[in-house]
Structure formats: C-alpha cells, structure tokens
Amino acid sequence: MNLAAIAKNYSMHNGESEAIVPYVPPPYNFASAPTFSQRTSQMESVSLGILNQAMSSTTGASGALKDEKAAFGAMAEALRDPEPIRQIKKQVGIRTLKNLKMELATMRRKKSALKIMIFISGCVTLATSMVGGLSIVDDEILRDYKNNDWLMKTIHGLNLLCTTVLLAAGKISDKIQEEISRTKRDIAKRESYVSAASMSWNGDTEMLLQGIKYGES
C-alpha cells in the first residue's frame, strides 16, 4: 500500500469518528417562575399548616373559638381546592352570604321580641305571686281576697298563664340562640372562604396572610 492510500484511509477514519461524537452544549441556568405543580404543592402545604394551627389551638369551648376553627377550616379548604372549583364556590358563597345575613337579622328580631315577652311575663308572674304572698301575711287582704272570688281566680289564672309563657318563651329563645350561633359560624366560614379565594398569591406566605378576612371583621 502506498502513502497516498494510507493517508486517504486515515482521513476517512477520522471523519467517521468525528461524525459519531455527540455535541454536548454547555449547561445554562435560566431563572424560571414556579410551575403550576410547585405552586399547588406550596398551597397544599399552607393548607396543611392552617389545619394544624386549627387543631393545635385551645379547645373551642366558647362560640368565638368554634368560629375561629371553622374559619381556619374554610381557608384551608379554599387553598386546597383547584382554581375553577374555588371560583365557583366563591360565587355561590357570596350569594349565600346575603341570605344568611337576612336570616340572622330575622332571628335577632325574634329573639328581641321574645325578650320583651319574657320580661312582661316575668313582671306579671312576680306581681301575682306577691299578691298571693301578701294575702297570706295580712288578714285584711286575705279577707278581701276570699270575698272577691273573681279576683282570686283572675290572679291565679294570670300567674299560671304568665308562668307558662315564661317557660315556653325561654325554651324558644334558647333554640333561637343556638340557630343564631350556628348561622354566625356559617357566615364566618363562607366569608373566610370568599376572602381566601379572592387573594392572589405569588408564593410569599406574608403576602398571602395580608389579604385574609376572618368572619365579620
């Protein structure tokens, strides 16, 4: 083999070797915004933190603490829900809030009327009881009391009627108070959900917490 053939074979071999070597570009680091999955994971972490805060707080013995736990749960639910569901619940919650506030105002008026009824019944019951007690102490009042049979029956009837009204109005007032507490808790939950759903978040927890509205505050 002559030198020309050797040189030709060598050049062909080097060309094939260079052709099969892959080109690896240098790495570049681009600053990118958080992806949707990362943002969802962050919001789920915040939701879990809110639930932990609600569970680790003091046992909700009072109505205010129970409302606080309900608000924590509503905010955690808002952060956990996907965006379309969150917006749907937000619109429904805004409409429901109007009806709940109207129902709350109606129940408060009923409770005020019952308080007036309880006060009047209590005064009449106390007065009739005092008349009956004085008739036992004073002989002259007892004599007049026995001579006027209609007066005795009227006083006893008023006492019995007002006592019954007093007991019934007290039970109804207690039930209305329970409904008021439950409605206020529902309002706090929906207002907290709407507030959390209305916030825009870029990943900063401090910015997230600035827009939170709790209950009727």
From Swiss-Prot:
InterPro entries, per database record: Orbi_NS3
Family to which the UniProt record says this protein belongs: Belongs to the orbivirus NS3 family.
Pfam families: Orbi_NS3
The protein's name: Non-structural protein NS3
Protein's job: May play a role in the release of virions from infected cells.
